[in-house]
Amino acid sequence: MSIKIPFLSKQVKETELEDWDNIPSHIAIIMDGNGRWAQKRGLPRIAGHREGVSTVNRIVKTAVNANVKVLTLYTFSTENWKRPKSEVDFILKLPKEFLHVYLPGLIENNVRVQTIGDFNAVPKHTQDAIEYAMEKTKDNDGLVLNFALNYGSRYEIIHAVKQIVQKTKASELDVEQLDESYFEKHLFTNGLSDPDLLIRTGGEYRLSNFMLWQLAYTEFWFTEKLWPEFDEDTFHQALMEYQQRKRRYGGI
């Protein structure tokens, strides 16, 4: 049955999903299309990024109401530094703006904020805002809102390998003890389950260096809708299609 959350502007209806017990525990989203959304309207690209913040709030609400356990949002990639500096600076201010406005609602609704990625490379004002939100929500045990910030999967894997090599050189690890479980403990996502469902907006069909290790058995769902257009109904469509799939994990 649906769970009504006070800060939702629109409640999820029971008839919108076939099975409320078969909800993906961990959903990861590649939020693509902000710039194109703005350009289609004759607006600067940053207007699309600002509109995308409203979509984040809307989808967090929907995920809470659907009892999703983890929502990972690809917020800023290690490749995004190649964009114009003015755009990069603007994007990296958005987490602070989002949390300034919406943190009280996240706290009220038991959401816990965390981040993955090379966090130390982002501006201090961004670090401060996220660290404050993490501290304020650390005891919450509802939805984990996980911002992938300055995140790149290849960097993550190399970073893990370097840590393991150092432990091997220091005789802290016998290489024969190395297995998938041990390796995963050195990834940024340590402690999180792998995504059950990946959603990518914007009509592109690629992973863009996102969670390459973790997505091995994840169900993928793509939509032509640009991120600012992504709404509750589209989110529910992704959930309903997920419910129709049979996850075999290499079996029959």
From Swiss-Prot:
GO terms for cellular component: cytosol. This is Isoprenyl transferase. Mg(2+) binds at residues 32, 219. It comes from Oceanobacillus iheyensis (strain DSM 14371 / CIP 107618 / JCM 11309 / KCTC 3954 / HTE831). GO terms for biological process: polyprenol biosynthetic process. Belongs to the UPP synthase family. Homodimer. The keyword Metal-binding applies. SUPFAM superfamilies: Undecaprenyl diphosphate synthase. Substrate binds at residues 33-37, 45, 49, 77-79, 81, 83, 200, 206-208. Its EC number is 2.5.1.-. Catalyzes the condensation of isopentenyl diphosphate (IPP) with allylic pyrophosphates generating different type of terpenoids. The active site is at 32, 80 (proton acceptor). The keyword Magnesium applies. One of its GO terms (molecular function) is magnesium ion binding. Binds 2 magnesium ions per subunit. Its cofactor is Mg(2+). Keywords: Magnesium, Metal-binding, Transferase. It is an enzyme of class 2 (transferase).
